[in-house]
């Protein structure tokens, strides 16, 4: 958890930042399972589903950014939101879901895991909570440097925003994130019986 979060904070490339943050998120899943409670297991499964959607969306947008600009290094970016507002907005939405902001699919997943871990092992729960805070710090910092401010090159000012086909695909990810975040019962009701059975067998 902590290694992935602090390593992500030290990166200067969006792809490497996403790779190290993935390590941190998988660590959170393992911690939820290790709590050996139904809430922890539900949170772990929810987080896995959230991780698949959010990480896929972020890596897809990063790939589209690389296709347009030829680089995902922070030093080559900056001011991207001016010429690519849709791409920047979706990247922010997916990042907020990765941070576990209320209203996104990341919130119920992280809440269940943190609740389960804090009630079963307070020290591990506090470490996980610290990781969530660090995760918010590195994402906001890299997003500000990569997407906000003045454009750093003419390639950025002339870049095209999301096309119709790209917008359709990214929009599907966004819908899944918002539906699962605003109506988490749509996921929890499906996995309730299996998680309860798993806990009972333990």
Regions inferred by a protein language model and the residue ranges of each:
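Hydrophobic transmembrane alpha-helices and their helix-loop junctions in integral membrane proteins
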Residues: 1-145
């Amino acid at each position: 958890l902590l290694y992935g979060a602090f390593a992500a904070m030290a990166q200067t490339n969006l792809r490497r930042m996403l790779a190290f943050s993935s390590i941190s998120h998988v660590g959170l899943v393992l911690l939820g399972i290790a709590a050996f409670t139904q809430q922890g297991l539900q949170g772990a499964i929810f987080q896995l589903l959230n991780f698949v959607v959010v990480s896929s969306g972020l890596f897809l947008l990063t790939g589209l950014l690389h296709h347009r600009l030829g680089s995902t290094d922070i030093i080559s970016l900056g001011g991207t939101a001016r010429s690519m507002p849709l791409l920047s907005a979706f990247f922010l939405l997916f990042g907020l879901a990765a941070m576990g902001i209320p209203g996104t699919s990341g919130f119920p997943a992280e809440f269940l895991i943190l609740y389960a871990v804090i009630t079963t092992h307070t020290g591990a729960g506090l470490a996980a909570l610290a990781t969530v805070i660090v995760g918010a710090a590195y994402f906001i910092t890299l997003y500000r440097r990569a997407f906000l401010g003045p454009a750093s090159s003419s390639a950025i000012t002339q870049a095209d925003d999301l096309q119709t086909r790209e917008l359709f695909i990214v929009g599907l990810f966004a819908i899944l994130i918002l539906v699962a975040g605003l109506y988490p019962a749509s996921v929890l009701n499906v996995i309730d019986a299996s998680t309860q059975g798993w806990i009972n067998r333990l």
